[in-house]
């Protein structure tokens, strides 16, 4: 089963708490262009559904960023959650070589 997720570029100067209240999760994509990173947002429900079938640092995911015309394979590098509420706070993706 191939996993894929569509991300949007995160607007600048927007508080991550405000994004979470709107049902979006802040995310970051590393490794797609050397040391450069991109700040992204992902739909909360889509992220939760995807994370049910993902193993961190192992499962390849097709990441699509339509705004930047970028598409590639990545793995979930890190998942940040609230310690006892288990609310999703942040995702980090690491892009592999094409």
Curated annotation (Swiss-Prot):
For this record, the Gene Ontology CC terms, alphabetical, are: ribonucleoprotein complex; ribosome
Instruction: Read off the Pfam families from this record.
Output: Ribosomal_L25p
| GO function terms (MF aspect) | 5S rRNA binding; structural constituent of ribosome
Keyword terms: Ribonucleoprotein, Ribosomal protein, RNA-binding, rRNA-binding
One Gene Ontology term of the biological-process aspect is: translation
- Can you tell me which residues the record assigns to a coiled coil? none
| Keyword Flavoprotein (UniProt) | no
Superkingdom in the source lineage: Bacteria
User: Which CDD domains is this protein grouped with?
Assistant: Ribosomal_L25_TL5_CTC (cd00495)
Q: Which family does it belong to?
A: Belongs to the bacterial ribosomal protein bL25 family.
Purpose of the protein: This is one of the proteins that binds to the 5S RNA in the ribosome where it forms part of the central protuberance.
Cite the record's note on assembly.
Part of the 50S ribosomal subunit; part of the 5S rRNA/L5/L18/L25 subcomplex. Contacts the 5S rRNA. Binds to the 5S rRNA independently of L5 and L18.
> What is the protein named?
Large ribosomal subunit protein bL25
Please report the organism this UniProt entry assigns to the protein: Synechocystis sp. (strain ATCC 27184 / PCC 6803 / Kazusa)
């Amino acid at each position: 089963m191939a996993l894929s997720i569509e991300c949007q570029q995160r607007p600048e100067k927007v508080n991550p708490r405000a994004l979470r209240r709107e049902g979006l999760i802040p995310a970051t994509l590393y490794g797609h262009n050397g040391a450069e990173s991109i700040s992204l947002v992902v739909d909360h429900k889509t992220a939760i559904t995807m994370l049910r079938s993902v193993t961190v640092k192992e499962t390849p995911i097709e990441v699509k960023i339509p705004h930047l015309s970028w598409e590639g394979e990545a793995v979930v590098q890190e998942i940040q959650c609230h310690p006892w509420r288990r609310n999703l706070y942040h995702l980090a993706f690491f892009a592999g070589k094409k």
